[in-house]
Amino acid sequence: RGLGDVYKRQAYAVRKQTPQNYKDYFDKRIHLIEVKNFGRVIDPAKDIAAFFEVKKIEAKIKPDVIHLHSSKAGAIGRVAFNGKIPMFYTPHGYSFLMENYKPMKRRMFKVIESVCAKRNCTTISCSVGEHQESLKLTKHATYVNNGINMAELQEIIDKTEKVEHPFTVYTLGRICYQKNPTLFNEIAESLPDVKFVWIGDGELRDQLTSENIEITGWADRSTAIRYAVNADVFLLPSRWEGLPISLLESMYMKKACVVSNVIGNRDVIHNGENGFVCTKVEDFVKAIEECQGEVEKLTEHAYQDILKMYNTKVMAEQYSKKYETAMNR
């Protein structure tokens, strides 16, 4: 039984990069309610309006469980609700760990998290590493690993044409500071005979200057999977992560995974066992060169990890247990 069989409503906000057809990605049983005043950046007037908006939504639908996702919703929600209804919060990467913010702002984010952590709410992290950070803020913390929908992904893979291709390294996502396009470019420059593909687009595309890099632009899901299927190595040099779905999907597709040594990545990838965890440019280069040899044992290990731990069936079962335990207290 999936969560959609029981938990039916979701309040959400739209970002600039949200696709126009975003509703198509949700199970039809889920009733979506837009929080119109919710925004990612700090805006006192809109944040106060969002505070009252979510309280109004809560009063109207009378939920059995409230689950807040990401820092902004976590702050507003934990202040807005009194904890009489079982409440959970998932950071998806703490803001105070994000290196694109200045130190003073990161300290402010940590103070906000520390204050909100005192509310009657359980933090459910999406990886072991994030859970360890949560325990520094509150003892009311647990974790459920992110997971992928294997059946949905396999259906797309089965319809995807596999073609002859040169040895190819790819990544997927927005070309932004977090995803570290500068390091991606340095690695590509160090391996001029290897083809690199960035599936996606973004404001920092100008940093991808190496001649052996192809930028696909924004692609729909089936197109993105087609690029991935016809590649060999998944490269994720991020500055920080929660627990990236793109990594889990690449593991399922039996791609050799080469990732940066940050929370989320290193929780899933164990160096030399099911992928490579790297810090310096030369580490990434060496790992990619190794991937041109025999890596079947490594990729099979990663694939088995997805089957056992990082899929939506396991994830839904764990969330359901936590929700039901909280409701029965």
Go through the PLM ranges and name each one.
Residues 2-7:
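Short, small-residue-biased leader/transition segments that mark boundaries at the very start
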Residues 31-34, 114-157:
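Donor nucleotide-sugar binding/catalytic pocket of nucleotide-sugar-dependent glycosyltransferases
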Residues 52-56, 106-123:
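Membrane-proximal helix-turn-helix segments that form the acceptor-binding/catalytic region
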Residues 58, 218, 226-231:
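Short alpha-helical donor nucleotide-sugar binding micro-motif in glycosyltransferases
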Residues 162-179, 185-189:
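Conserved donor-binding/catalytic core segment of Leloir-type glycosyltransferases
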Residues 239:
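Aromatic "clamp/platform" in nucleotide-sugar-dependent glycosyltransferases that forms part
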Residues 256-259:
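Short hydrophobic beta-strand element within catalytic cores of glycosyltransferases
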Residues 270-282, 289-293:
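Conserved acidic donor-binding segment of nucleotide-sugar-dependent glycosyltransferases
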